[in-house]
């Protein structure tokens, strides 16, 4: 057994503890059940409230679903509850979907066009207060136009509309109005998916295979997900042999790399980590400070030391996976000397304690992170260390998720993004467009810097409304070029999501580009319905 070197002082102790545990022992069930540990809270299973927006919900199906097998590049979409891929009119403003026949929800009721209509209308209904409403602002109306046909009418051309059809469909009978967050679907979901939730506690959810699933009953018959929010605790329970798999940050995952009976799985993602630069904070709002901080961070060192090589440096929210829409020149080099010069030229001069000062105010601000997220903690501390080397004092503070968004106007936050990365529009729009800087628009994490850049707004809007692939790609390259000239965040890294699994004879795993979410709904288990064994 070989221990991975302690690449970060912040993670030294948990690595050593996990590395010295015993090899994996055989699971008692040895059959068709899996037990996984997740760091995300259980519940909130209503698609109208945003659950499974990227198509990962095992209790629901969308009209389309992701097709795996590509660990780089945008995955293809294929019909799910749609009988065939949606068909647009000439300007991509009207999309017609023929739905699949003979499908039933797990409560026994038949699936039909009325369920599709009810789900999407609920998102648009102000009474639902759906967090998805803003991201569906292109949807003008949805109606059934026949016994097996649904028509979506859009306010403007939107060529990536099929990505919006990954959302799970709920029965119309369950969508009776009122706040989405108060719907019974949050704790008792009813869908057409390959699994059915049979019990739910705060610390455990149990799913059983839907034996009447329209695409064939899954061979994994029972899935238990236990909620373990602490990274180190998940690693310890994984090492004890009580779990079949868990999501773990890279340094902890790597401690299992040379252990008998375990495998470390890394999936490419468009999930970024970065530091917000609040427009209402006089230090982080300064354009010179924003540029200097972007030049001062050693992203390569973060990838190697904190991600253990499982990731890539990020200067903008756009990863290389977008091909022609990616602008390779839009990067911030690591240049501490230039960063210091920019600050000096802008009037930020070193004070007696080494912290720069301008007009009597010190170059000091706070970066928040979620207390139980060791990866965000380590990145926050590395960012603070790099900033200190150019005379900027960054205080690092653990802040509970429940109050985190409310403090983002005054304090910076170590955030992640890439919730729906299957088109550049959904990767970028809510992060950079100024419409999300307005109070009450989107979630508290959308455009969390309150960033406003008219050039970027125009390019994002032009790309969103274009049906020409080459023109869209050019617009997105223009977004990146404009962004590095006037950054609104300090983007740090794109993650490879890391997981640990116990050896087994199950086959069928398929790599896929993952979104920001990386609980056990993704990883090796995203396509659990397809797993087979000899």
Which residue ranges define each predicted feature?
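N-terminal lobe/hinge region of extracytoplasmic solute-binding protein
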Residues: 37-90, 121, 190
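Gly/Pro-rich hinge or "lid" segments in bacterial periplasmic/extracellular proteins
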Residues: 67-72, 166-218, 222, 336, ...
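Aromatic- and charge-enriched surface segment that lines or borders ligand/interaction sites
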Residues: 84-128, 151, 283-285
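Surface-exposed binding/hinge segments that line
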Residues: 98, 132-175
């Amino acid at each position: 057994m070989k221990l991975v070197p302690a690449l970060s002082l912040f993670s030294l102790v948990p690595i050593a503890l996990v590395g010295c545990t015993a090899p994996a022992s055989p699971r008692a069930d040895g059959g068709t059940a899996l037990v996984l540990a997740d760091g995300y809270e259980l519940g909130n299973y209503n698609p109208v409230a945003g659950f499974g927006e990227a198509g990962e919900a095992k209790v629901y199906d969308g009209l389309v679903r992701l097709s795996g097998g590509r660990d780089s590049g945008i995955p293809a979409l294929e019909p799910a509850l749609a009988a065939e891929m949606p068909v647009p009119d000439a300007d991509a403003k009207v999309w017609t979907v023929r739905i699949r026949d003979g499908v039933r929800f797990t409560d026994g009721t038949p699936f039909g066009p009325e369920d599709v209509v009810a789900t999407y209308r609920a998102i648009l209904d102000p009474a639902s207060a759906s967090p998805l409403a803003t991201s569906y602002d292109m949807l003008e109306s949805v109606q059934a136009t026949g016994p097996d046909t649904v028509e979506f009418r859009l306010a403007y051309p939107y060529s990536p509309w099929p990505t919006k059809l990954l959302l799970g469909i709920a029965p119309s009978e369950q969508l009776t109005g009122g706040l989405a967050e108060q719907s019974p679907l949050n704790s008792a979901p009813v869908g057409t998916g390959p699994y059915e939730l049979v019990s739910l506690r705060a610390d455990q959810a149990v799913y059983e295979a839907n034996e009447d699933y329209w695409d064939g009953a899954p061979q994994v018959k029972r899935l238990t997900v236990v909620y373990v929010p602490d990274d180190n605790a998940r690693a310890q329970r994984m090492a004890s042999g009580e779990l079949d798999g868990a999501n773990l940050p890279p340094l902890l995952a790597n401690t299992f790399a040379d252990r008998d009976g375990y495998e470390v799985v890394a999936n490419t993602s468009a999930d970024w980590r970065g530091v917000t630069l609040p427009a209402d904070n006089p230090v982080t709002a300064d354009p010179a400070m924003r540029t200097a901080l972007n030049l001062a961070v050693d992203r390569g060192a973060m990838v190697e030391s904190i991600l253990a090589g499982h990731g890539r440096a990020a200067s903008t929210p756009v990863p290389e996976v977008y091909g022609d829409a990616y602008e390779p020149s839009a990067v911030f080099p690591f240049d501490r000397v230039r960063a210091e010069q920019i600050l000096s030229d802008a009037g930020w001069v070193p004070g007696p304690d080494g912290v720069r000062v301008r007009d009597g105010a010190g170059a000091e601000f706070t970066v928040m992170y979620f207390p139980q997220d060791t990866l965000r903690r380590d990145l926050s501390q590395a960012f603070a260390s790099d900033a200190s080397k150019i005379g900027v004092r960054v205080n690092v503070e653990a802040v509970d998720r429940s109050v985190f968004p409310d403090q983002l106007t005054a304090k910076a936050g170590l955030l992640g993004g890439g919730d729906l990365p299957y088109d550049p529009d959904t990767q970028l729009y809510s992060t950079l467009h100024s419409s999300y800087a307005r109070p009450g628009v989107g979630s508290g994490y959308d455009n969390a810097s309150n960033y406003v850049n008219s050039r970027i707004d125009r390019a994002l809007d032009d790309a969103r409304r274009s049906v020409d692939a080459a023109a869209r790609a050019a617009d997105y390259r223009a977004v990146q070029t404009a962004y590095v000239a006037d950054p609104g965040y300090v983007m740090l890294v794109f993650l490879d999501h890391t997981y640990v699994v116990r050896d087994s004879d199950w086959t069928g795993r398929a790599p896929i580009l993952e979104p920001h979410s990386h609980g056990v709904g993704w990883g090796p288990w995203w396509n659990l319905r397809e797993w087979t064994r000899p």
